Amino acid sequence: MPKMRLDTLLVERGLAESRAQAQRLVMAGQVRVDGQVALKPALSVVTNARLEVDLGPRYVSRGGEKLQAALEAFRIDPGNRICADVGASTGGFTDCLLQHGARRVYAIDVGKGILHWKLRQDPRVVVMEETNARYIRALPEKVSLVTVDAAFISLKILLPVLRVWLAPGGEALALVKPQFEAGRVAATRGQGVIREPRLHRQVLLGVLSFADQQGFGLQGLVRSPLLGPKGNAEFLAWFVYPGGAEGDLSELVARVVPLENSP
C-alpha cells in the first residue's frame, strides 16, 4: 500500500486547506490516524488510513486567537525562530507560536503552575514561571520575536527590557491594554473598563510614542478581534527594533480608533 506524508494526505482528503494548516492541526494534537493521535506532520502513513480531525479550539487559550490575528494581519512567520512570550499564563501565545513552527519559546510569567501541561512537556518550550520579565536583564540567547500579553503592568515598563533581549532587526508583537495604561483614575471610573475612544487614542499615542523614543519602529496596528476581560478593547502593535515608525503615529492610531467616534 502506498504511503504519503500526513500533512499532504490531510490536504488531499480535504481535511485541511493547506499543508501549513495541516501541520498546525497535527502539532496541536488535533489529528488521529487510525484512532491514534499523531504529532508529526511528516509522519508517513498509508493512503487509506482512517483520518480524524478534531476542529475544537486551536489553542490552549483564547489568547492564541489574538496572536493568530496579528500574524495574519502583519504577515509574520514565526517559523524556525527563537521567541519569547511575556505574560505566557496558560500559554495561548506560546501555543500559537509553536504551531507556526517556532524553534524555541521562552514562556515567561510571574505565576506558577499556570502553563498548560501540553506546553510544559514540549521540548521547544523553556518554562520561566515565577519570573517577572521586567527584571530579566538577558535571556540565554538573543530572540528574534517577542510577544507580550501582560496584565497589571504598562508596556512602558517592559519595552526597555525587551529591546535588550532582541537580536538586531527583531520584532515585537504586543497587546496594548488601555485598562493597564490609562491610569488608576480612568480605570476605576469605568470599573476596570475603558470605553471612551478618546482614552483609547490617548493610551495608544502614549505607548507608541514611548516605543518610538526607545528605538522601536511601529510597523502595524490593529484592533484585537477578541475583547479582553470585562469587555475591554485591546490593540495589537507590531514593532521592529531598531527601526522607525511606518508613518505618522497619530494617523496610524486614527485608522484604528477613528476620530469621528469621539464622544
Report residues per predicted region.
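S-adenosyl-L-methionine
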Residues: 103-157
